[in-house]
């Protein structure tokens, strides 16, 4: 049987290789299997792995591993560095089949040089745990990097220094050593007004998706407001960042993973704004404001994990997380409405987090598995505000929870059964405590190699104590899914979920009561056809969202000659959204598509988004109906690297409309962007970026950047950049808000020159 499979795999590879090759696009093929080494032993993942070869035709500016994924079919990299494959975030990045950065795969993507690796292997249905591989189905996605031999068991480093005007500099260092017993990756950067850096405190604080913090640190609107041009046009920004991860092999079956992250940012903002409140009739008012904000953010996170894996008999995993985050803001605000006044405010926020998880799995007679796990966390959130208008405001928030599970599982031929009991105690604030006790049973059946059926049922009781009141009720959850897998690309996935709990409990947990999910994709060599449809219908009693929620999305993807053509549609309907000032009914629709023109080596893409909302808002003591409509259209064209030239052009149109009472306000903005790169010689690269911001009514702005990169050798590079060459010192943008028009004016640092030198060894 295995011989037949290998023959099928080889024939499949021949079909893939026989497709028309295009030098401008990264080639890929399906490989028979990949070896994954979780500490001890070898796990083989077959029939679900794609290999991408890293060619010399990639963008010459490619430096780090995350730059590679911008050129690979199906991958997308966000501004935060998260990597998605066909809309699903990857679970992990392995190096030669071994887990290295188990806490955050971005440590590998951001701090390792792309030249260290020869190929990228995509793993579908990835399982990091040998026990889960036998008993639980998973649709997780992971990436394995094949490292070149000359970079193993040696120190690899990237060192860079950037000097900018006026008086700006930044130093960066990335050091790694990937040995047999010790694997370490570290990155440090120090920035003094050279580049603008913003990071999300919430992005680095979560331990896992199932553990949520009570509240994120709230940034001032000046810091959270986005601008339609490059962030480094703003000045007065200093930061330092240290990220490190270590993986230590202890003996033959134990591993210790350690990660340390430290980030601090000190930045200043200044802007002036004018807001016109207009609802028609007799109500119309204008407000002018000049604001200066000083902000300091810091985050320190320490994680340690211990894993022991004794082949197929016993596995244990323990983790400790310590986090400390702080935010301090000083505000100077001058307001002119009926009269003028100056306000000085000081606010500080902090959050301390402790998290622990541990569990053991024991296999008996190669059929039975006993499992025990426990999770516990404590979060303390503090916020204090001293303001001339607010006077003072202090908030202390505490969240504690502990979850324990005792379960067992066994296998009878192609059927796997698992049952157990879970206990949950959660405290939020001083007046709310939740207790849940429920038993669960799961069944998984593999009907041949193609069909897989799973069911899950949970029944128990819940007890909520809130401000002296007590709620008790019977709770249950039913879940079922059917998976038909013909090949790596050909599958049908159907899922249904139904649950019932106490409405008051959902104040803490946002979950749909009813959920349906279906996915279908089919492959006809040499053409891949993918159609994904997902529908979610549910009702939730969360303190933010209440009422009926509906989500639908459908995506069509066609892969021909290693080129992806796709079109997608998704909609989102949410009614009766609870806000602090009333209810909101909204609808959102998104459509996108792209096609690759072989004759011109150009990818054309289109994107359309529509959002509509209705709500009541109290304005000057009077409830006013408000309707907001926002539309965005984006058309882009991007060439692949063909010989010496690369171009990227995008045209975006944004339209905003608000109706408040009898008054109507609208604004339209066009944003054009052109990126050109030219490889002047083998080790030289020049680039130009031009942006044109054109409001329908208002001033036209143009921004131009230029860079010249010279690489005398494989290890040394010099880059000269000129930012904001049009010397724009002040930028004014108009926004449509629910009850009027807001004009915001921001001061820029003007023309800026930078020179960067970097070396890799």
Segments predicted by a language model, with ranges:
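Conserved C-terminal beta-signal and adjacent last beta-strands/turns
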Residues: 630-761
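Outer membrane beta-barrel strand-and-loop segments of large Gram-negative receptors
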Residues: 440, 522-528, 545-642, 754, ...
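Structural signature of Gram-negative outer-membrane beta-barrels, strongest in the C-terminal barrel
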Residues: 353, 369-379, 398-558, 681-690, ...
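Residues that define the transmembrane beta-barrel architecture of outer-membrane proteins
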Residues: 139, 162, 166-171, 236-244, ...
